[in-house]
From Swiss-Prot:
The gene is CFT1. RNA-binding component of the cleavage and polyadenylation factor (CPF) complex, which plays a key role in polyadenylation-dependent pre-mRNA 3'-end formation and cooperates with cleavage factors including the CFIA complex and NAB4/CFIB. Involved in poly(A) site recognition. May be involved in coupling transcription termination and mRNA 3'-end formation. PANTHER family: DNA REPAIR/RNA PROCESSING CPSF FAMILY. GO terms for molecular function: RNA binding. The lineage of its organism: Eukaryota, Fungi, Dikarya, Ascomycota, Saccharomycotina. This is Protein CFT1.
Length: 1357
């Protein structure tokens, strides 16, 4: 009984497209991160501003586009799961996504396939938008779209037109294809359906003999849908190429699709067939007059008639025995385009001003290391006269930290391909927007300065029919200027190639290791006062690969920079008065003593005794007024107007206590406890009097709880003469006791407006003329509202609502309709901060929560929320607004300070000036992220692997791994017989351990291991060093594997280190610790994991695990061992209990006994899966286990000896299996925060990191909580519309292990449950009633407990 929740959203960009999806005003960029679809507005200077974002309940595996009928917008095809396609359309009225149709093919695919289906199917789109194609292995599904009957005639007329408005983006990583945005065939409705019936075929039904499909693509410039199939009738790999040297075949088929109401018929006609192609070809990239087939070792060009015109050899492994083709031998370049790590983009020729073609067709390829290659293609008719490849000479290191490109999309397409903006998503490294300048000039200058040495064309054309082509190609042979067989000279371009970084999207994936340690709370005292982040621990992860690898600090709260600290004796509220742009006066008040004081900010905070400020009363509000020439002070019963020397000018007395004040020059709005409001205007001429503003008469019938003066254009369409104006108007805004928000202008003429639906917190709100209800029931829940702009460079208007229960709701103003606000419930990722019905009284009882808006907090427009747990609302330009905890101490008051800072007062009367930390910080995910670079120019440690935290020294240790040239050495240390120095060699590894001080994040000590060694595991463990006294000491244990040749047995070693304190180096106070080796031992077999158990430590040696004990003389002896079926992938301990994961056979549950020494097998998993990581999952007194496998599943098993089918616990009971959207790489056990009461036994939770940059947690639940939340989840799934028509149950639970688990006890998905908090109030209560009489109250408490479970990191250990 557990619940899954995302701690961090995915950050790796897997797919992207440029299209008109939500608006026709500009071309948008659609970006996919695992299950999140983001829509960005690209600017001309390459900035990306988020406009919409949607979170789906399934893994998005591919996307495509088709045009809408009678609309400039496009529909989105979303491929999810194994084989599902959702067709989506953006609804501009509701600002959400509508699902037009859902097509499920998995069942049909399984019925026709003779082998197990691949986990992901591949989507292909016809350039003419007549159909879509989805294939999995040899099974192909066609989804036709309705077209006009006159299409054929229209296409014949348009046959000669150039399709240069199109653009093809092709990702070889998942063979994912975006689509062009043009529509050559006009679609129309057949009946009322959007699509025709689908057809599912085996590849051999299209072309006899087609099997083992490698790739399928639609070709271009055909009047009918035409596909190219690349396949191998007999599978071949590098080891058996001598038996079948050229096994790959290629066929071009034209499809005749005949849609009908009942069934669709597809007939195929063979255009061309090509055989005897190299075995390593893997991807088809269509171009204007044919296709480029990309292989690991070759590039081949086949035209649309199926003629293999030319082949480029990329490396020395390429097959030089190809027949009937022109061979360009560039094997000395040693380029490799691996199938899953190569991406391409094809851009057709642009049009010149006179309508002709510029002949600048462009094809770019990127390899695993992010090198960009230009494919040179020049043709005369269908004859290719130039075909070559060269690496773009990028002189800067913009792509040094990026690897594994996933997708490429062109932005801001212009009439020329000379310069282009490209958006590139990477598996490791930030997604980048790059500007390629002078691309054409680079190519031209390169051709003009080619060296004329040797020939690089190998001709072997024996067919008499190709003699003419032979002559043509022979003339072109000397034109190629790349490195040749006879000359090793290189070519340098005359014109430098300029690449410019315009913007980026933050990526922290892949996460390979997680630990918990002190980062923001290392210093107990800052500026003489306690650290505001005291007792706070952070999650720290290793992120990225290669030179881009770094540490990512996942902060549980915002860590501000402290500029100034002050200590006060009597203070509860604080205000800063600026005069002429300088901080002049600091006003404090103490409500407990009814006292106010003035301090001179520019005079070392000396107490100011002059002036007539009311000091013997509690100040409710004070600020500058009247163009900074006056000061306004409001006490509990009076309003005072002063000049800048605090000479009193006007006094106004109130009969009731003032509870709220809002000021905007030249108006002041006062709300009193009776529910009345007063509005005053400053006399314009002398600025010595306050004039009362007339209020609408209908306000006399209302009870007002708070008021606000703001500027907005949301009511313009209701104001005479302003319906089309964008100018912001001054609006007096009020919240009534029946939770209505009303507006009126100064010249109101008794006409006021209301925001409909806000009392129920509906998903969509709209402004209309106010209608007085028949009966008003005062039940105030809305405490405060704000309408202001949030963001960094691109600020957007939001309505923010704070309730008396501490909840924060946020609505965004519709860009299409200024009078409407909406809340995206499908992406409502605002943190939960409170609960209605007094369900979370603890959060709002001690210190009042009040929102404060700051238009410039170090460049960001933010909202602070004071309280016992303070919050900050902040928005990055490329993300939705987020709510974070601000520090780890209460805040009672906050005021602007200096230009970009704030001054805050805590609950013990300390004041601090905070500035937002922006260096290497990112506030666009669910928690603040800080990037820490360990490598530098001198020391590049490449990939950071295992990370641990040394609690006693408060230091981090991380292992690194860099690639080095591999040397095949025998057991004697000499090079093996047959070693050839002249061929490309494999790469080996070299590892080491770094000791890092988090105060400076500098490496203060390191240990390097020999070449061909890898640190597989590293742990910080409390090891018993004296068996009599049971004294323990914290040691670092590292397990190492040595990479040797195939003929030598594997070996490894384990090393034990202590972190000792030393005298620091002069001028380097952070170098006060060093690593000291305690013990090391070489062992037979690789050491894949180490683990502490009951004061000893366990290591794995190939198929054995041994527990070792450290003696007093620091020697180590083995005391117990156990055999493992295949290979240990992970191991964890809990006291004297162990779980050991196997690479093929699940995992075992082991008990360790020290008297006598032995390892006892308590149970094992019966389900056989490839264990990736595992952890104990403790729920009360029950012992559960969480294990993840290579198929993206997390399994929960239980040790239950009382279960009848468990054989007294020997078989672990399989409770549930839950599908993840990415591969899990690490998992750890953390204490769990209990927000309501303290449990009798400690509670825990699991936290795991994933390859896509996301982090998740698994939280155990009690039976009562589980049942309540299970009902709510079921109701939301059944009664609420799901994005893309996806079923959250199916996406998470439909896996191969579903039948083994308890069908009535599946793992819950908090992503579904938290939608409960975003529903309208009436729908929320309706759903809660299904779970019980008081379920609404209890459900909120359950949700808060899950939401706040990670706050255990803020309470120390």
């Amino acid at each position: 009984m557990n619940v899954y929740d995302d701690v961090l959203d995915a950050t790796v960009v897997s797919h992207s497209l440029a299209t008109h999806f939500t608006t026709s005003d500009y071309e948008e960029l659609l970006v996919v991160r695992t299950n999140i679809l983001s829509v960005y507005r690209p600017t001309r200077d390459g900035k990306l501003y988020l406009t919409d974002e949607f979170k789906f309940h399934g893994l998005i595996t591919d996307i495509g586009l088709i045009p809408q009928k009678d609309s400039p917008l496009s529909c989105l095809l979303l491929c999810t799961g194994v084989a599902k396609i959702s067709i989506l359309k953006f609804n501009t009225l509701t600002n959400s996504i509508d699902t037009l149709s859902l097509h499920y093919y998995e069942g049909k695919f399984k019925g026709k396939s003779l082998v197990e289906l691949a986990k992901i199917s591949t989507l292909r789109m016809d350039p003419g938008s007549s159909c879509a194609l989805l294939f999995n292995n040899d099974i192909i599904a066609f989804l036709p779209f309705h077209v006009n009957k006159n299409d054929d005639d229209e296409e014949e007329e348009d046959e000669d037109e150039n399709i240069d408005d199109s653009e093809l983006i092709h990702s070889m990583n998942q063979k994912s294809q975006g689509t062009n945005t043009f529509n050559k065939r006009k679609r129309t409705k057949l009946g009322d359906k959007f699509t025709a019936p689908s057809v599912v075929l085996v590849a051999s039904e299209l072309y006899e003999g087609a099997k083992n499909i490698i790739d399928i693509q639609f070709l271009k410039n055909f009047t009918k849908p035409t596909i190219a199939l690349l396949y191998q009738p007999k599978l071949v790999w590098a080891g058996n190429t001598t038996i079948s040297k050229l096994p790959t075949q290629y066929v071009i088929l034209t499809l005749n699709i005949q849609p009908a109401e009942s069934a669709t018929k597809i007939e195929s006609t063979t255009i061309a067939f090509v055989k005897e192609l190299p075995w390593d070809l893997h991807t088809i990239v269509p171009v204007s007059n044919g296709a480029i087939i990309v292989g690991t070792n070759e590039l081949a060009f086949l035209d649309n008639t199926g003629v293999l015109q030319s082949t480029v050899l990329l490396n020395s492994f390429a097959d030089k025995e190809l027949q009937k083709t022109k061979i360009i031998n560039n094997s000395s370049l040693e380029i490799m385009f691996r199938e899953k790590n190569t991406t391409s983009i094809w851009i057709p020729s642009s049009k010149s001003k006179n309508g002709g073609s510029n002949n600048d067709e462009t094809l770019l390829l990127m390899d695993l290391k992010s090198n960009i290659y230009y494919i040179q293609m020049e043709a005369e008719g269908r004859l290719l006269i130039k075909f070559d490849i060269f690496k773009l000479p990028i002189v800067n290191d913009l792509l040094k930290e990026n690897s594994n490109p996933k997708c490429i999309t062109r932005l801001n397409a212009t009439n020329s391909n000379k310069n282009m903006d490209l958006f590139i998503g990477f598996g490791s490294g930030n997604a980048l927007v790059l500007r390629l300048n002078n691309l054409k000039s680079t190519i031209e200058t390169r051709e003009a300065h080619n060296p004329s040495s040797g020939t690089n064309s190998l001709m072997d054309i024996n067919d008499d029919d190709d003699e003419e082509m032979d002559d043509l190609y022979a003339d072109e042979a000397p034109e190629n200027g790349l490195t040749t067989n006879d000359s090793k000279g290189t070519v340098e371009t005359v014109q430098p190639f300029d690449i410019e970084l315009l913007s980026s999207l933050r990526n922290v994936g892949p996460i390979t290791s997680l630990t918990v340690g002190k980062v923001s709370s290392i210093d107990d005292v800052v500026k003489g006062l306690p650290n505001p982040n005291k007792n706070e621990y952070s999650l720290v992860a290793t992120s990225g690969n290669g030179s881009g690898s770094h540490l990512t600090v996942i902060q549980t709260s915002v860590q501000p920079e402290i500029e100034l600290a002050l200590k006060f004796i009597s203070i509860t509220q604080i205000w800063n008065l600026k005069i002429k742009g300088r901080d002049r006066y600091l006003i404090t008040t103490d409500s407990t003593k009814s006292r106010s004081d003035i301090y001179e900010s520019d005079n070392n905070f000396k107490l100011h005794k002059g002036g007539r400020l009311r000091r013997d009363a509690t100040t409710v509000y004070i600020s500058m007024f009247g163009e900074e020439k006056r000061i306004i002070q409001v006490t509990t019963n009076h309003l005072y107007l002063y000049d800048t020397h605090f000479r009193r000018l006007t006094t106004i007395k109130f009969d009731y206590e003032v509870i709220h004040v809002s000021v905007m020059d030249p108006y002041i709005l006062v709300t009193v406890s009776r529910g009345d409001i007063k509005i005053f205007e400053l006399e314009e001429k002398n600025k010595r009097k306050l004039l009362k503003v007339d209020l609408p008469e209908i306000l006399n019938e209302m009870v007002i709880t708070s008021g606000l003066i703001l500027k907005s254009n949301m009511c313009n369409e209701f104001l005479i003469g302003l319906s089309k104006s964008q100018e912001e108007q001054l609006l007096f805004t009020f919240v009534t006791a029946d939770n209505q928000i009303i507006f009126f202008t100064k010249d109101h003429n008794d006409r006021i407006f209301q925001l409909n639906g806000v009392d129920q917190l509906n998903e969509s709100l709209y402004i209309s003329t106010y209608q007085l209800g028949d009966e008003i029931v005062p039940d105030p829940s809305i405490k405060q509202v704000m309408i202001n702009k949030l963001g960094h460079d691109n600020k957007e208007e939001y309505l923010t609502i704070l309730t008396f229960g501490g909840e924060i709701y946020q609505y965004r103003k519709l860009p299409q309709r200024r009078s409407r606000f909406y809340r995206n419930v499908t992406r409502n990722d605002l943190a939960i901060t409170g609960a209605p019905d007094n369900a979370y009284a603890k959060g709002v009882s001690s210190i009042e929560r009040i929102m404060h808006y700051f238009p410039d907090y170090n460049g960001y427009s933010v909202i602070f929320v004071t309280g016992s747990v303070p919050y900050i609302l902040i928005k990055e330009d490329d993300s939705t607004p987020k709510i974070f905890k601000f520090g780890n101490i209460p805040l009672v008051s906050v005021t602007p300070w200096s230009e970009r800072s704030v001054m805050c007062v805590d609950d013990i009367k300390n004041a601090r000036v905070y500035t937002l930390t922006t260096d290497n910080m990112y506030y666009g995910n669910k928690l603040p992220l800080k990037q820490i670079k360990i490598s530098n120019v001198l020391d590049d440690y490449k990939t950071l692997q295992k990370l641990v935290y040394h609690e006693r020294a408060q230091l981090f240790l991380v292992s690194y791994c860099k690639r080095v040239p591999y040397e095949a050495l025998g057991e004697d240390g000499e090079k093996v017989i047959g070693y050839d120095e002249n061929v490309p060699h494999a790469e080996g590894f070299q590892s080491g351990i770094l000791l890092i001080n988090p105060k400076s994040w500098k490496v203060i000590d390191k240990i390097d291991f020999p070449k061909n060694s890898v640190v597989n595991e590293m742990r910080s463990s409390m090891i018993q060093i004296n068996s009599k006294t049971k004294r323990k000491r914290e040691y670092i244990i590292a397990g190492v594997a040595n990479a040797t040749t195939e003929d030598t047995p594997p070996t490894g070693a384990f090393h034990i280190y202590d972190v000792i304190e030393v005298v620091p180096e002069p001028g380097k106070p952070d170098t006060n610790y060093k690593l000291k080796e305690i013990f090391q031992e070489e062992v037979s077999g690789t050491v894949s994991t180490v683990c502490e158990v009951s004061g000893r430590f366990m290591i794995s040696q190939s198929q054995k695990v041994l527990v070792r004990d450290i003696q007093e003389d620091n020697s180590v002896i083995p005391v117990a061992f156990l055999d493992i079926p295949v290979f240990v992938t992970d191991s964890k301990s809990f006291g004297n209990l162990l779980i050991i994961g196997d690479a093929m056979q699940g995992f075992q549950f082991i008990g360790f006994d020290a008297e006598p020494y032995r390892m006892i097998s308590l149970g094992r998993s019966m389900s056989k899966f490839q264990t990736m990581s595992l952890e104990f999952l403790v729920n009360g007194g029950d012992m559960y286990f969480a294990a993840t496998d290579a198929d993206r599943n997390v399994h929960v098993l239980k040790y239950a000896p009382d279960e009848p089918n468990s054989l007294s616990g020997q078989r672990l009971v399989h409770c549930s299996s839950f599908t993840l959207h990415s591969t899990n790489s690490c998992m750890m056990l953390l204490p769990r925060n209990e927000e309501f009461g303290s449990p009798q036994v400690p509670s825990f939770q699991n936290v795991g990191g994933q390859v896509d940059g996301s982090v998740f947690k698994i939280v155990p639940l009690s039976e009562e909580k589980y049942r309540r939340l299970y009902v709510i989840q079921q109701q939301i799934i059944d009664r609420e519309l799901q994005l893309g028509g996806l079923n959250p149950r199916m996406e998470r639970l439909a896996n191969d292990f579903y039948q083994m688990g308890h069908s009535m006890r599946p793992m819950l998905d908090f992503n579904v449950i938290r939608r409960f908090c975003g529903l309208a109030i009436d729908r929320r209560k309706s759903i809660a009633q299904k779970a019980g009489r008081h379920a609404h109250f209890e459900a909120w408490r359950d949700i808060i407990n899950i939401e706040f479970s990670m706050r255990s990191l803020c309470q120390g250990k």
